């Protein structure tokens, strides 16, 4: 199979439909992970999956798992934990720390992490540009001091939030962060959350599968529409419990 090599001076991607037709979803390979290439990738439903020997591999997945914020489902056991209220959720309080924890988290059936140092640097750049955001769940420890317990990060373009990775140091911490983040993002105007892959974890939150063509059309429309206000850095209240 011939793998498309992406030009260093051109951020355009081949049509993901061709990669999906081959079943593997590999759209192309690049020698860089520039912010401009990352943003162009997300706008087209493409994301970097891993790197090898200095090359970055870009994929598209279809059908695409997504969460529509107005259809968010909170599992009963998690709703009970949320009502307990012993946690605190914030956005963009410690982005670099969240990414580092995601990189260090053990994953089933994975040897190591795809979030290599080059990826961490790239997403930190997107964070500095106002595109990448982290949601953090904090719990009090035995001394009563509040500490980071879990969270996730992703990229926001227009009214789409592209989820990337989660971690949890305490049970349910990443789930709490997600359950609070979705209504918060919806209030700001986010209409679609990209989960990339279909997993049991996201199905519990009501994720749905979209044909890639439908997903890509939604991106085309929603990426161009700005949020009602910037995500910023603040506390996030859990709503609708």
UniProtKB/Swiss-Prot annotation:
Principal subcellular localisation of the protein: cytoplasm
EC number: 2.3.2.6
Catalytically driven reaction(s): N-terminal L-lysyl-[protein] + L-leucyl-tRNA(Leu) = N-terminal L-leucyl-L-lysyl-[protein] + tRNA(Leu) + H(+); N-terminal L-arginyl-[protein] + L-leucyl-tRNA(Leu) = N-terminal L-leucyl-L-arginyl-[protein] + tRNA(Leu) + H(+); L-phenylalanyl-tRNA(Phe) + an N-terminal L-alpha-aminoacyl-[protein] = an N-terminal L-phenylalanyl-L-alpha-aminoacyl-[protein] + tRNA(Phe)
Gene Ontology terms: cellular component: cytoplasm
Broad EC category: transferase
Record GO biological process: protein catabolic process
Residues that span the membrane, as ranges: none
MF-aspect GO terms: leucyl-tRNA--protein transferase activity
InterPro entries xref list: Acyl_CoA_acyltransferase (IPR016181), Leu/Phe-tRNA_Trfase (IPR004616), Leu/Phe-tRNA_Trfase_C (IPR042203), Leu/Phe-tRNA_Trfase_N (IPR042221)
Top-rank taxon: Bacteria
Pfam families: Leu_Phe_trans
Keywords: Acyltransferase, Cytoplasm, Transferase
Subcellular location: Cytoplasm
Keyword Cytoplasm: yes
Record flagged with keyword Transferase: yes
Cystine residue pairs: none
Listed HAMAP family: Leu_Phe_trans (MF_00688)
The family this protein is said to belong to: Belongs to the L/F-transferase family.
NCBIfam families: aat (TIGR00667)
Protein purpose: Functions in the N-end rule pathway of protein degradation where it conjugates Leu, Phe and, less efficiently, Met from aminoacyl-tRNAs to the N-termini of proteins containing an N-terminal arginine or lysine.
Record-given protein name: Leucyl/phenylalanyl-tRNA--protein transferase
Organism listed in the record: Neisseria meningitidis serogroup B (strain ATCC BAA-335 / MC58)
């Amino acid at each position: 199979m011939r793998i498309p090599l992406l030009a260093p001076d051109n951020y355009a991607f081949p049509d993901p439909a061709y990669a999906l037709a081959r079943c593997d979803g590999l759209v192309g390979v690049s020698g860089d992970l520039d912010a401009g290439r990352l943003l162009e990738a997300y706008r087209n439903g493409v994301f970097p999956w891993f790197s090898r020997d200095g090359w970055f591999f870009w994929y598209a997945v279809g059908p695409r798992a997504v969460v529509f914020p107005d259809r968010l489902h909170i599992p009963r056991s998690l709703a009970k934990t949320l009502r307990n209220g012993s946690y605190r959720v914030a956005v963009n309080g410690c982005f670099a720390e969240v990414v580092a924890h995601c990189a260090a988290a053990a994953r089933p059936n994975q040897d190591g992490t795809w979030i290599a140092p080059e990826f961490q640097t790239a997403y930190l750049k997107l964070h500095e540009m106002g595109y990448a955001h982290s949601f953090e769940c904090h719990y009090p420890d035995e001394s009563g001091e509040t500490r980071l317990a879990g969270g996730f990060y992703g990229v926001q373009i227009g009214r789409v939030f592209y989820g990337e990775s989660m971690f949890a140091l305490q049970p349910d911490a990443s789930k709490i962060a997600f359950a609070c983040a979705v209504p918060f993002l919806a209030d700001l105007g986010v209409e679609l959350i990209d989960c990339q892959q279909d997993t049991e974890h996201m199905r519990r939150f009501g994720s749905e599968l979209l044909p890639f063509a439908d997903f890509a059309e939604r991106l085309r429309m929603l990426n161009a529409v700005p949020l009602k206000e910037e995500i910023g850095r603040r506390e996030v209240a859990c709503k609708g419990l």
